[in-house]
């Protein structure tokens, strides 16, 4: 009817409205124009002045329209109705004062009745409701009863109010029933205006439809009435609301409790409510999910009221309308803003699948026949999102609610009712939770939450935090703002309209002070009421069978838990609130999780299908974390602790509890380490990161990336985003920049202002949004903290854990996404780098606990993963520790120690025989798990579960111990000893940590609950985190001693040494007696974790007292971790039934690990008694697994510790180790068993009679054993024969070797030495080459004991040589065919071993004959040496030569005897041998060298054999020569003594020398011949020994495979010339004539005579030592005879037949007959007769006489090479037949270079080995390197390693030491003909200056093998001496019984070597030789790892071959002869003339 046209003059229209002449329709039209165009003030004035005109115009037109509607009812009429109702609304709005005076009372009432008629369409009825409420608002108290009755009937579905006329319904009120008996005028019947149309959509639930409308219009029209007195607006709402409460609420909320008050809260914990009956209603069209309801009356109405009430507290952001990305700061048209808002809300609704209930408020347009109504109606698609245009209405409403206590109580009660709804109405509950969440987390609190004395914060610049999802604030702005106010980005600024809006605040100031005071209940009251009321959600019996409802229930519970967590971590709570929180958590945990065992078993494996299963992890985590956090902030009573103990100990059937407990203990241990021991478990001194990593750790301030990422992370997720490799670091906060001093001061101020609400003084820090758990559960849980992105500090005790949390997650998932967890910003913390441990704790716990997919630990004790990058916080040192009474560093003794009356410990060091007791119960043992996989809170369906759980656990675990008040440092408060006590000696004296005030660190704001998918709802992890954080209170506090922790009754909050200690011990025992856990798997899991916990304690102990700078050793720590605290639980666990086998195994493992450590405090007698009893029973146990566990974990150190009485178990261990060795299982601890046996082989000689427990009975019976040695050796021997494991077999062979040496040294002549030798010798040909190699090493070692072996059994050494020969003969054919280098290396080792044995025996022994059967079946005799050369010949030329009988050395069968069975059966190994690769192991790293390898392999044996031959030829019988053992080869060169050469080294001038020539002999040997001047006037005559000789000598220098040798030879002319005349020459004839010899006897007699004479001569002269000369010979002796005899004695190699002297006639040749012999004799006699006759006949003839001759004068040869030539001719080198093997060398520079190179090579194997001495207390390199001497035992040991050599004149291997005394004067040195070892002994080298120390460290550090003699009480650590080398450490620890324990540390790639092994225990008598042999073998093993490594002889052969190949000069004989005749043109030296 009224189309909108451009208006003319408003004044004109005004006049026309007032013009009574105009018709009503025209006046109406102009009225509309005035209304639409006039200002509101003018309009109000206009209406006030002309109300009657206006009403008339309206009423006339209304009547007209009503009539036309009844006639036609078309759409146009309906639109006219809309238009006229618009005027009606304006009348009601603009004239409230008149209406209040009942102006037009009946007329308006009638019109409204017509609109409200139940026959109207719903749209009109709803419009009627709206206008009726406007009218009622204006009337207020002036209305009549009828209006109130109508108000009570506006909503259909409620029972009608009663009156004197019966029930009042709306129909009755509109058309009252008439009493028609009297004839009266009746009023016209009211009829409907617009009946429903056919197309209108009906409403299923009219009650809800009208209730929503009523509630909505009550609010949105509050301000639409233009009252002159604005207070009437509020009164109008109050009027309507009070009648709503009166008429409707009793039906909607029948159980409304009016007693509940926020001001006097009822804090009784509610009862569990039974499960309602859920009925399926329908399926949701979009999601297809079933929707359920409970059919309770008015349930929907209840939900509507709740949602309506909620909407006033969840108001939208007023400041800018919706934030449209990219349009910041621009003014946008309203429609775009609306569109954006709807977009946002749509997005949100997507995320909140459960908000479907909102859809019950259907959009209204669809019900209307007209469009104009909807245009001017506010958008109301959701009751909760009221458009911003109406914010002022909401403020008024909120003001009413906040105006008096009854209204505040009403709000709280309705919210309580929300928590009582059935779970199918979870959407409404979520809204209420959201409201509470905002109240708790926002800065601007509602008035009733402010403290009574607190003033309202008005400054609008304090941003109020809002949930992150509500805003998309731009990151840059966020960063700026964060810098400015110290708040974090995720806290978006929003003007909280209800605390900061100007008009609202004015209103407050106007309102009376009294009221204001009255309604302020304070935050704590609201928190308490929330905690109690919200617990109803948990206490509703879940509908586990309906998955949708179960999901909803889980989601709701997690949301509540998240708020609890937020409160725990971020909100300041007083003692009462904390207690309330803990009580509620306890009861909730108990009621949700306690169930009968049958019920529990029923859901086994289907935990996810129950609420309890889903919530177990989160609940336990929240409970434990809250508990810890509470204890850090307030004093928690003993009763509450007892409650916790009884609840948790009754729920141990939940695996999640075990998991949470273990994670908690893990973090608590870190906190304990930090606070009590000043150690950071993630950055321990022993595993310091490399420098680079440390640099990385230094953060670079709060980086932008960090801020960006921290915007939107949930508690749980936020922690899961750790970026790889970076450790979170704390940053100084903006408020504490500046000097550390100021920071400290500030921190103290802060600590002292604990009670001031931090929110007033500190800017808020970040909050993190918390998302629900998604698939990435476990791994992501900890966010990406970069090392470079330090966490902002917060001052509360809560935020530090965040980093921890992060860390833990990392452990679980490497590919963490790159987002940062939000951290709390630093609100003024002191020492910024010291994070708060509580949070750390949580975080840390979080870190590990979170994923359902993740399993927690591996099953080995070593598998505990420690995050590498925990925050620095653990780094600070806390020095103040009490000293233990007796002065010994005391272990914290037991879980309850001496202070408590009923403990079992017998002294202050008692080992924990006490227990956690609860209500008089003692839990005698504490159990600790080892390494079973613990899935962390695995089945929690929302990820949050995990995270949080870990977090909390950490926290929680931090919270649990009681200190005994008398003995501990906790002041005033006596904690009950029942939970756990710590004796004075153990607990720290108050360490005053500066305490951070518990400031309210805002922490991640939990998720925007409405918009989270419930399935993914995660619990806030951060909780954990923060709980465990300490504020910056880790510094040693400057407070006076009376300030102590809250736990001790003081005021200091946060972590301190005493708090950490007590909390750790209480939490340790919080499960009660762990041996009472019924489920074997959980029992095992707990004990698995106990193993891990113990590992951490052990790690702490190992890291105490470690030198930080490696320059000084700190004093021993005063406080040490209680490593034996767990033993009572462990002891008890060993007594459990087999059902708990896994847990028992863990217990045994941990007992063994605990007791095989060095004990700081010696265990007392009671403890040892228990321990030995348990070990005795365990070792004899029928279950082999238990025996295996004990053997595995006691080996190798058990007997080396010297525990008092440990030898009582020797028999048990021998028997048990034997059982392990004989068991069939390969995975048994076989090596460990052999090590234990091997460590005992030296004991029997020490203890002749050993008292020990009898191994046949479990009773404790001590017997004396004398046969221990036999038992050990029997077991070791059988292992050496039959052990199926290779490494174990090797250890057994080493044990045999050690035992043989031990017996030989003690000269026990034990009969089994032969058997042991037999086993070792037979093992030489074992198929596994590693085992054979070890056997070979054992034989090699026995070389040093050859003399003792000979004494024991004279033929043993020779037998060993024969066995070696036979073994090589046996192996050679197969080895030559093999392609494996190992096989060849074995034969080479055997050859070298054979060489050492040969060199060790005298020649006489080697020449003894061997009887063997030859092929020609004749008995032949050959010496051992002969066999040696035969086998060597075979090795050089190939095994095929053995096929010739002449060359066959000896076979194994030839050696069979009583003592030696060469074919003894050895069991083969059963473990898979590592596959050989045909490539050389050494060269496998270099691929392209195959040819070299094959050549090397092929020649290996041949070259080794040739080396052995040349070595024997050169040294057998000669070594050591007069130069001593250090001199093996000649140092002489061609230029020495050579007067033709001036040079000091080989130089080209030698080639021009006429006196030298170079030759090659046999293509293998280089020979240099030099003619040099003879020596003159040398005492003793020099080379010629005083005989007449030439003036030149010949020097021959030979270079061959085994070295370089030189001989000087002189030509001898005769005896020295006697001065005086020479004797005249006499004639032979005259002599014989004068003598007249007798007639010779017959030939036979003559022969006999000779034989006799010869025999006599042999007897007389056999051992002649001087050369027979005329002067020494007796008359009857024959000179020639004597000389031959002398030669044979002194130079046996000249004998033609072994053992037969040269002067014994040769036997008669076989080929001559007796007749031929007689003929020869006769011919000789005839000749003799004829000559005799001739002489007699012509004697006197003149021609028979001659004159006397003079001796001719000798001529000096002219050639400088004459004598060389002569010698070569004598040796036959110039002959034709030698031409093929004797050649000249080309003389050139290259040859000299090659010779120099060859001469520089060692000719023996060389080793340099470092020796260190570590005195007691030395743990740093400086003190160790500056030792200048050691104990007597050490000096004796060093003396036994070798002999001292003077370095200034030592001519052997120097190992880099200097002759100039800079590296010392002397050092031990050892040499044989094949090996040289020099020891770099640290105590022998000077260390006066830094320079000498550096040099010393360089020499020692570069050695690959270190021998360390340690007298320190702690084990030596690799790394004390920092070096890249030191691949093998042999550490010797002297024991109390004069034995020595050996520890061998080697890098993993180093192969096995012996004879000593890790864990060996040996006697001092054999120690030096054993250690030396082991060091040499270790050095060889290391060399074997070098790719393409060659032994020195291989290298030497290669060099020789190169020289021969490249420098041999082929010549004709003539050229050769010429070169020999004259090597170079002769030039005469003047010096020769006078020579």
Swiss-Prot record:
SUPFAM superfamilies: ARM repeat, Rap/Ran-GAP. Residues 1713-1746 form a coiled coil. The modification Phosphothreonine is found at residues 753, 777, 1001. It is found in: Cytoplasm; Nucleus. InterPro entries: ARM-type_fold, Rap/Ran-GAP_sf, Rap/Ran_GAP_dom, RGPA/RALGAPB_N, Tuberin/Ral-act_asu. Residues 345-365, 807-817 have a biased composition (Basic and acidic residues). GO terms for biological process: activation of GTPase activity; negative regulation of transcription by RNA polymerase II; regulation of small GTPase mediated signal transduction. Residues 343-384, 714-754, 807-834, 848-911, 986-1008 are annotated as: Disordered. The modification Phosphoserine is found at residues 710, 720, 772, 796, 859-860, 863, 985, 989, 993, 999, 1003, 1477. Its main location: cytoplasm. GO terms for molecular function: GTPase activator activity; protein heterodimerization activity. The keyword Electron transport does not apply. Residues 1795-2003 form the Rap-GAP domain. Keywords: Coiled coil, Cytoplasm, GTPase activation, Nucleus, Phosphoprotein. The keyword Cytoplasm applies. Residues 1326-2034 are annotated as: Minimal domain that binds to TCF3/E12. It holds the Pfam family RALGAPB_N. Component of the heterodimeric RalGAP1 complex with RALGAPB. Heterodimerization is required for activity. Interacts with the HLH region of TCF3/isoform E12. Catalytic subunit of the heterodimeric RalGAP1 complex which acts as a GTPase activator for the Ras-like small GTPases RALA and RALB. This is Ral GTPase-activating protein subunit alpha-1. It comes from Rattus norvegicus. The gene is Ralgapa1.
């Amino acid at each position: 009817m009224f189309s909108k046209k451009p208006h003319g003059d408003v004044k004109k229209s005004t006049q026309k409205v007032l013009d009574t002449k105009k018709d009503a329709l025209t006046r109406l039209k102009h009225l509309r124009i005035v209304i639409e165009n006039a200002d509101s003030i003018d309009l109000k004035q206009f209406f006030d002045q002309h109300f009657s005109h206006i009403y008339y115009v309206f009423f006339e037109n209304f009547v007209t329209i009503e009539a036309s509607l009844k006639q036609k009812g078309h759409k146009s009429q309906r639109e006219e109705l809309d238009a006229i109702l618009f005027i009606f609304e304006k009348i009601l709005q603009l004239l409230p004062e008149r209406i209040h005076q009942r102006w037009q009372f009946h007329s308006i009432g009638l019109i409204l009745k017509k609109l409200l008629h139940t026959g109207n369409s719903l749209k009109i009825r709803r419009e009627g409701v709206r206008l009726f409420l406007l009218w009622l608002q204006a009337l207020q108290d002036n209305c009549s009863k009828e209006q109130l009755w109508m108000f009570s009937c506006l909503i259909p579905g409620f029972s009608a109010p009663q009156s004197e006329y019966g029930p009042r319904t709306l129909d009755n009120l509109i058309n009252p029933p008439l009493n028609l008996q009297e004839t009266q005028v009746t009023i016209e019947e009211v009829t409907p205006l617009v009946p429903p149309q056919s197309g209108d959509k009906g409403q299923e639930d009219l009650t809800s439809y009208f209730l929503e409308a009523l509630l909505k219009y009550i609010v949105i029209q509050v301000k639409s009435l233009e009252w002159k007195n604005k207070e009437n607006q509020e009164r109008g709402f109050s009027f309507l609301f009070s009648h709503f409460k009166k008429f409707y609420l009793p039906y909607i909320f029948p159980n409304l409790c009016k007693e509940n008050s926020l001001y006097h809260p009822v804090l009784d914990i509610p009862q569990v409510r039974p499960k309602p009956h859920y009925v399926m209603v329908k399926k949701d069209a979009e999601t297809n999910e079933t929707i359920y309801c409970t059919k309770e009356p008015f349930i929907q109405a209840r939900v509507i009221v709740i949602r309506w009430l909620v909407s006033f507290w969840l108001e939208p952001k007023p400041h800018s309308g919706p934030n449209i990305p990219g349009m910041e700061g621009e003014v946008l048209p309203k429609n775009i803003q609306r569109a954006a808002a709807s977009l946002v809300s749509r997005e949100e609704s997507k995320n909140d699948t459960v908000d479907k209930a909102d859809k019950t408020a259907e959009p209204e347009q669809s019900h209307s026949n007209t469009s104009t109504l909807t245009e001017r109606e506010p958008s109301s698609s959701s009751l909760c999102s009221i458009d911003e245009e109406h914010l002022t209405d909401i403020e008024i409403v909120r003001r009413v609610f906040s105006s008096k206590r009854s209204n505040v109580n009403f709000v709280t009660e309705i919210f309580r009712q929300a928590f009582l709804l059935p779970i199918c109405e979870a959407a409404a509950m979520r809204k209420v939770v959201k409201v509470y969440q905002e109240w708790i987390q926002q800065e601007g609190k509602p008035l009733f939450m402010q403290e009574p004395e607190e003033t309202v914060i008005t400054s609008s610049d304090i941003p109020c935090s809002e949930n992150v999802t509500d805003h998309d604030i731009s990151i840059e702005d966020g960063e700026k703002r964060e810098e400015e106010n110290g708040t974090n980005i995720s806290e978006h600024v929003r003007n909280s309209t209800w605390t900061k809006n100007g008009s609202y605040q004015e209103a407050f100031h106007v309102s009376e002070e009294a009221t204001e005071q009255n309604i302020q209940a304070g935050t704590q009251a609201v928190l308490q009421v929330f905690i109690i009321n919200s617990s109803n959600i948990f206490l509703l019996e879940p509908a586990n069978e309906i998955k949708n409802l179960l999901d909803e229930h889980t989601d709701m519970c997690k949301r509540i838990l998240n708020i609890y967590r937020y409160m725990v971590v971020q909100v300041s709570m007083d003692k009462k609130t904390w207690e309330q929180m803990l009580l509620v958590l306890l009861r909730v945990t108990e009621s949700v999780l306690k169930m009968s065992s049958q019920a529990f078993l029923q859901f086994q494996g289907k935990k996810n299908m129950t609420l309890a299963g889903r919530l177990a992890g989160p609940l336990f985590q929240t409970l434990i974390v809250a508990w810890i956090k509470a204890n850090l902030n307030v004093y928690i009573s003993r009763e509450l602790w007892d409650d916790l103990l009884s609840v948790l100990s009754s729920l141990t059937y939940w695996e999640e509890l075990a998991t949470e407990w273990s994670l908690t203990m893990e973090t608590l241990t870190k906190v304990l380490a930090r606070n009590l021991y000043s150690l950071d478990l993630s950055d321990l001194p022993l595993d310091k990161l490399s420098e680079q990593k440390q640099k990385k750790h230094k953060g670079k301030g709060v980086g932008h990336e960090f801020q960006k990422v921290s915007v939107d992370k949930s508690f749980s997720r936020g922690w899961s985003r750790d970026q790889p490799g970076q450790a979170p670091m704390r940053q100084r906060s903006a408020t504490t920049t500046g000097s550390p001093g100021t920071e400290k001061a500030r921190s103290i101020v802060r600590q002292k202002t604990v009670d001031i609400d931090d929110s007033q003084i500190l800017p808020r820090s970040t909050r993190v949004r918390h998302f629900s758990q998604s698939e990435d559960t476990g791994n992501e849980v900890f966010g990406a903290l970069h090392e470079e992105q330090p966490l902002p500090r917060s001052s509360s005790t809560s935020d530090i854990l965040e980093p921890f949390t992060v860390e833990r997650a990392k452990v679980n998932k490497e590919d963490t996404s790159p987002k940062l967890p939000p951290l709390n910003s630093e609100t003024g913390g002191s020492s910024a780098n010291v994070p708060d441990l509580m949070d750390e704790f949580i975080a840390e716990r979080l870190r590990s606990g979170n994923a359902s997919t993740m399993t927690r630990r591996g099953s080995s004790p070593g598998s505990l993963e420690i995050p590498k990058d925990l925050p620095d916080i653990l780094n600070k040192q806390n020095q103040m520790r009490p000293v233990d009474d007796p002065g010994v560093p005391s272990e914290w003794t037991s879980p309850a120690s001496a202070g408590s009356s009923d403990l079992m410990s017998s002294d202050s060091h008692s080992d924990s025989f006490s227990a956690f007791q609860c209500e008089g119960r003692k839990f005698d043992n504490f159990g600790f798990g080892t390494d079973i996989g613990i899935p962390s809170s695995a089945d929690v369906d929302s990820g949050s579960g995990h995270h949080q759980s870990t977090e909390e656990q950490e926290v929680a675990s931090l919270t649990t111990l009681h200190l005994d008040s008398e003995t501990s440092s906790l002041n005033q408060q006596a904690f009950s000893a029942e939970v756990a006590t710590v004796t004075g000696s153990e607990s720290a004296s108050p360490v005053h940590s500066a305490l951070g005030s518990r400031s309210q660190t805002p922490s991640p704001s939990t998720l925007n609950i409405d918009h989270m998918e419930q399935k993914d709802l995660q619990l806030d992890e951060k909780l954990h985190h923060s709980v465990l954080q300490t504020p910056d209170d880790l510094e040693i506090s400057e407070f006076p001693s009376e300030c102590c922790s809250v736990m001790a009754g003081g005021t200091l909050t946060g972590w301190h040494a005493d708090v950490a200690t007590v909390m750790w011990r209480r939490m340790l025992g919080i499960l009660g007696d762990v041996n009472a856990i019924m489920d074997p798997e959980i029992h095992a899991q707990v004990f698995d974790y106990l193993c891990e916990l113990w590992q951490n304690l052990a790690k702490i102990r190992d890291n105490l007292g470690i030198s930080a700078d490696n320059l000084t050793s700190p004093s021993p720590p005063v406080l040490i971790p209680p490593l034996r605290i767990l033993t009572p639980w462990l002891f008890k666990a060993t007594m459990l039934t087999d059902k708990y086998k896994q847990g028992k195994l863990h217990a045994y493992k941990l007992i063994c690990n605990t007791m095989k450590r060095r004990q700081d405090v010696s265990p007392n007698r009671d403890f040892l008694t228990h321990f030995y009893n348990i070990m005795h029973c365990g070792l004899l146990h029928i279950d082999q697994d238990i025996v295996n566990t004990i053997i595995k974990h006691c080996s190798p150190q058990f007997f080396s510790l010297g525990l008092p009485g440990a030898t009582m178990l020797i028999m048990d261990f021998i028997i048990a180790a034997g059982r392990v060795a004989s068991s069939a299982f390969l995975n048994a601890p076989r090596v460990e068993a052999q090590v234990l046996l091997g460590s005992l082989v030296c004991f029997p000689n020490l203890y002749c009679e050993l008292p020990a427990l009898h191994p046949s009975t479990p009773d404790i019976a001590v017997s004396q054993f004398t046969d221990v040695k036999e038992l050990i050796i029997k077991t070791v021997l059988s292992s050496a024969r039959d052990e199926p494991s290779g490494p174990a077999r090797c250890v057994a062979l080493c044990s045999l070797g050690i035992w043989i040496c031990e017996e030989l040294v003690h000269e026990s002549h034990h009969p089994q030495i032969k058997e042991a030798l037999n086993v070792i010798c037979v093992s030489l040909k074992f198929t596994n080459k590693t085992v054979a190699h070890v056997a070979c090493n054992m034989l090699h070692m026995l070389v040093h004991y050859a003399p003792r072996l000979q004494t024991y059994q004279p033929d043993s050494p020779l037998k060993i040589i024969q066995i070696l020969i036979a073994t090589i003969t046996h192996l050679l054919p197969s080895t030559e065919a093999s392609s494996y280098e190992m096989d060849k290396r074995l034969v080479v080792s055997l050859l070298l071993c054979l060489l050492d044995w040969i060199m060790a025996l005298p020649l006489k022994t080697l020449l003894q004959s061997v009887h063997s059967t030859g092929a020609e079946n004749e008995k032949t005799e050959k010496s051992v040496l002969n066999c040696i050369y035969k086998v060597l010949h075979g090795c050089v030329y190939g095994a095929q030569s053995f096929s010739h009988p002449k060359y066959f050395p000896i076979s194994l069968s030839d050696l069979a005897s009583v003592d030696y069975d060469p074919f003894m059966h050895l069991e083969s190994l059963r473990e898979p041998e590592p596959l050989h690769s045909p490539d050389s192991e050494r060269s496998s790293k270099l691929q392209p060298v195959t040819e070299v390898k094959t050549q090397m392999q092929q020649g290996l044996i041949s070259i080794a054999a040739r080396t052995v031959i040349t070595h024997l030829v050169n040294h057998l019988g000669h070594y050591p020569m007069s130069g001593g053992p250090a001199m093996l080869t000649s140092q002489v060169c061609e230029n020495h003594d050579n007067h033709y050469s001036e040079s000091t080294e080989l130089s080209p001038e030698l080639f021009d020398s006429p006196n030298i020539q170079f030759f090659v002999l046999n293509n293998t040997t280089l020979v240099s011949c030099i003619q040099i001047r003879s020596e003159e006037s040398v005492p003793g005559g020099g080379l010629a020994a005083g005989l007449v000789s030439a003036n030149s000598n010949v020097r021959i220098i030979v270079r061959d495979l085994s070295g370089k040798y030189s001989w000087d030879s002189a030509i001898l002319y005769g005896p020295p010339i006697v001065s005086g005349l020479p004797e005249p020459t006499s004639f032979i004839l005259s002599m014989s004539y004068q003598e007249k010899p007798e007639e010779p006897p017959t030939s036979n007699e003559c022969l006999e005579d000779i034989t006799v004479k010869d025999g006599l001569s042999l007897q007389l002269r056999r051992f002649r030592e001087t050369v027979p000369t005329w002067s020494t010979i007796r008359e009857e002796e024959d000179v020639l005879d004597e000389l031959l005899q002398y030669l044979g004695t002194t130079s046996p190699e000249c004998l033609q037949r072994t053992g037969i002297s040269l002067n014994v006639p040769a036997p008669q040749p076989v080929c001559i007959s007796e007749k031929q012999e007689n003929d020869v004799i006769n011919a000789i006699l005839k000749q003799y007769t004829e000559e005799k006759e001739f002489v007699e006949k012509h004697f006197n003839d003149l021609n028979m006489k001659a004159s006397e001759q003079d001796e001719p004068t000798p001529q000096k040869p002219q050639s400088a090479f004459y004598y060389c030539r002569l010698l070569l001719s004598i040796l036959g080198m110039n002959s034709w037949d030698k031409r093929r093997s004797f050649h000249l060398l080309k003389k050139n520079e290259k040859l000299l270079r090659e010779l120099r190179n060859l001469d520089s090579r060692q000719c023996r194997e060389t080793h340099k080995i470092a020796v260190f001495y570590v005195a007691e207390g030395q743990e740093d390199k400086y003190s160790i390197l500056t030792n200048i001497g050691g104990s007597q035992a050490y000096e004796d040991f060093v003396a036994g390693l070798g002999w001292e050599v003077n370095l200034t004149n030592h001519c052997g291997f120097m190992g880099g030491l200097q002759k100039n005394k800079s590296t010392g004067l002397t050092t031990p040195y050892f040499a044989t003909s094949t090996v040289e070892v020099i020891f770099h002994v640290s105590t022998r080298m000077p260390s006066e200056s830094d320079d000498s120390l550096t040099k010393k460290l360089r020499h020692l550090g570069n050695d690959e093998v270190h021998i360390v003699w340690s007298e320190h009480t702690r084990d030596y650590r690799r790394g004390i001496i920092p070096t890249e080398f030191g691949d093998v450490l042999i550490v010797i620890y002297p024991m109390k019984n004069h034995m020595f324990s050996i520890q061998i540390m080697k890098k993993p790639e180093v192969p096995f070597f012996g004879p000593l092994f890790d864990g060996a225990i040996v006697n001092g008598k054999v120690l030096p030789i054993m250690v030396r042999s082991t060091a040499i073998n270790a050095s060889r093993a290391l060399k074997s790892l070098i790719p393409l490594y060659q032994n020195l002889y291989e290298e030497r052969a290669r060099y020789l071959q190169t020289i021969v190949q490249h420098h041999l000069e082929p010549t004709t004989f003539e050229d050769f002869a010429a070169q020999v005749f004259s090597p170079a043109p002769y030039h005469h030296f003047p010096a020769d003339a006078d020579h």
